[in-house]
Amino acid sequence: MSALLATPAFAASLAVNIEIPRLNASEYHRPYVATWIERADNTVAGTLAVWYDVRTKTNNPEGEGTKWLKDMRQWWRRGGRELAVPVDGVTGATKPAGKHQLSFNEGTAPMPKLVPGAYKLVVEAAREVGGREVVSIPFQWPPTAATQPTATGKEELGEIKLDLKP
């Protein structure tokens, strides 16, 4: 009697390391940050994370922070305005200065199942009484080998590292 042995199918994964620099400013506000994947035609394949002021106010149950999401202009125009926030597993509170890691497995929300091809990881930050910055890292999907491409922002973002694993 023969037995069929099933080999587990492992989906490719990616991790994103986002550095938020501590700025020397008299009025410092934590930045709003959006992280998403774009296809080669600049359409959004999936929004991975959106950090914004989620604190609720007694007179505004959704929190006043949602009205400032549009300050992340590129994300907003490419698909953010269609997102009904909050979204479990995607939206969260703003983060303090430092390094923050996000990990995703293909096909497990919020990481979409991607068709093979060229993509960009895009990270956008906008800060009240501050600036706005967009950093992108091109990559091929699915990864054929473990790679760690990086890009560095100039003011609102520090080093952005994409950790791809087949």
What are the residue ranges of the model-derived segments?
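Ser/Thr/Pro-rich, acidic low-complexity intrinsically disordered regulatory segments
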Residues: M1-A3
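Sec/Tat signal peptide C-region and signal peptidase I cleavage site
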Residues: L5-A11
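Short amphipathic, basic-aromatic surface patches that mediate peripheral association
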Residues: V16-Y28, W51-T56
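Low-complexity, serine/threonine/proline/glycine-rich extracellular segments that form mucin-like
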Residues: L23-L48
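Short coil-to-beta strand junction motifs in C2/discoidin
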Residues: E27-V33, E64, P116-Y119
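Structured domain cores in non-transmembrane regions
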Residues: A40-L114
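Glycine-rich, aromatic-bearing surface loops/beta-hairpins
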Residues: A97-L102, P110-P166
